[in-house]
Amino acid sequence: MKVILLERVEGTGVLGDVVTVKDGFARNFLLPRHKALRANSANLKSFEVQRAEIEARNVKNREAAGKSGEGLDGKQYVMIRQAGESGQLYGSVAGRDVADAIKAEGGKVDRSMIVLDKPIKTLGVHEVKVKLHAEVTVTVTLNIARSQDEADRQARGENVVAAQFEEDRAAEAEAASDMAAGGAGSFEGDHYES
């Protein structure tokens, strides 16, 4: 299906381009979201008449997105989640969770603006892209931890899961050396009289 793009669509074209796309893409994505018009003669004439207005509106929206993006770009958000000892989350962090964390601190984003290739399933510091406009994308940092103390340690660059693993290993080694030093089967106070 031939369509006229009303804004920049990644991988398809920019404002004003007449492009041929698959029918499903046009019907299910571009047309319902007002990102394109069917490329018939009436719409082509109408678009040419309104082109300056549409371009001005697009520039205005891009500038507004750029201003809101200045406050978000590079900002770090802490998310406290439950996780196992290996650092694997019980559940995952999806786009909705990221949007909620940003909104909680005063950001104006929608979950459809969050760009995640796949849900986040591990503790640590993760970078996430937020697409505020077709031409404005910012990066925010998510610090996912089990507690605020852990989040602070991760923010300083410490790998909390590796540190926990080393602490556990040291404790096991100490317990093993205590057992070896005490001797097997000689426990004081285990004397029973009959």
Swiss-Prot record:
GO (cellular component) term, any one: ribonucleoprotein complex
Entry keyword annotation includes Protein transport: no
MF (Gene Ontology): rRNA binding; structural constituent of ribosome
Region (Disordered): 167-194
Keywords noted in UniProt: Ribonucleoprotein, Ribosomal protein, RNA-binding, rRNA-binding
Function: Binds to the 23S rRNA.
HAMAP family xrefs: Ribosomal_bL9
Protein name: Large ribosomal subunit protein bL9
Species name: Caulobacter sp. (strain K31)
